[in-house]
Amino acid sequence: MVIVLMGVSGSGKTTIGHCLAEQLGWPFYEGDDFHPPANVAKMSQGIPLSDDDRLPWLDRLRDLICEYVESDKNAIVACSALKELYRRRLAQAGDRVCFVYLQGDYDLIEERMEARQNHFMKAGLLESQFQTLEEPEKALVVDISEPPEAIVGFIRDQLGL
């Protein structure tokens, strides 16, 4: 199984991903690490990414996910996956891909982003992320107002892990 932790920037994908990976003994991949330098530069300057910017990045993540699914191994991937188009692209590996949507309100996430240091994604881009977001119909939805330990426990319970 490959768990894709999705949601807007600041929703806790990295924190939850590391916690899940530690508890399950699965590898964790930070989707941000797969962005080409041009994407990172744009976001660092407060410029939202277009679909054309995102597609090569999504293809790199899709290829990683396919490797795990095809070899019958487990992994956790953090990826915003804001649009249904993006999720379909990532899910091309088949039914062993499970999306977990880390859902929270704008104010909570903005507060978290403003507290972050050394991250290229600035709080000023949060509005564009929410505008781009198409809430998923096929995902485990998780309320991020709970502490990370509770979120991880909920995900494990719901997925039978």
Model-identified regions with their sequence ranges:
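Walker A (P-loop) ATP-phosphate-binding motif of ABC ATPase nucleotide-binding domains
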Residues: 2
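Hydrophobic anchor at the beta1->P-loop junction of P-loop NTPases
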Residues: 5
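The conserved Walker
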Residues: 9
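Conserved lysine of the Walker
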Residues: 13
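Conserved substrate/cofactor phosphate-moiety recognition/catalytic segment
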Residues: 18, 22-60
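Glycine-rich phosphate-binding loop used to anchor ATP phosphates in small-molecule kinases
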Residues: 52-93, 102
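Conserved phosphate-donor/acceptor-positioning beta-strand/loop module used by diverse small-molecule
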Residues: 93-112
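Small-molecule kinase domains that catalyze NTP-dependent phosphoryl transfer to phosphate-bearing small molecules
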Residues: 115-154
